[in-house]
Amino acid sequence: GRRHSDPTDLVRDFTLMYSDRPTFAHVHLTEYTHDDLNGVKSYDRDLALKLRMMERSGALDDTFLVLMGDHGYRFGGFSKTRQGNVENNMPLLLVMPPKSLEEEQPELVRNLRDNNLLLTSHWDLHQTLRHLLALGVGQQRVDTFYTGSLSPGSSLLSPLQPRTCTEAGISLWFCSCPEDQRVIEPDVARQLLEAVLEDINVFLQPLELGCQELE
């Protein structure tokens, strides 16, 4: 089948061929990274070379490029570590604005850089794309274009303030900010478990289902 070099070449050719009109392309690459934790290392150099070639060819002159993962490594020993949990909840997101945007509206690119160390999510990326659409149709003020939707995000091209996971629209289940804490002592947990099992056994006994007693 096709290898990852083909889609990246297609992206370059696509941006060059349609450089005179607005376009959108989504390429999903999984060959080297999905099932192998070490695959990223072998893919990293090749991808960097491809991006440099695209930059030299002019394919990125007016292209807003987003390189992102949909999730981290979700199985295996690494996924059970603290770092593995963080990467799963906060996958890679790299945003490369075109030179034309920095020349025409440098404050937007400056906002993007300032937001680099803030908590962001896919909601913010969605609003960023809406922001770009507003710029594409020549709106001077884009606030009314990309706010007021069902998305809780904010454009990464706008100034952002430090936020909590709740404020950023991130479920607490996927929030990597709080540290893991032991909520109860082992002895208390054991007592609770024994009490629950006893209640279940009492409930099942008169039913005569032949169930083995839980312990």
Locations of regions flagged by a protein language model:
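Long acidic/mixed-charge intrinsically disordered regions
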Residues: 23-25, 64, 132
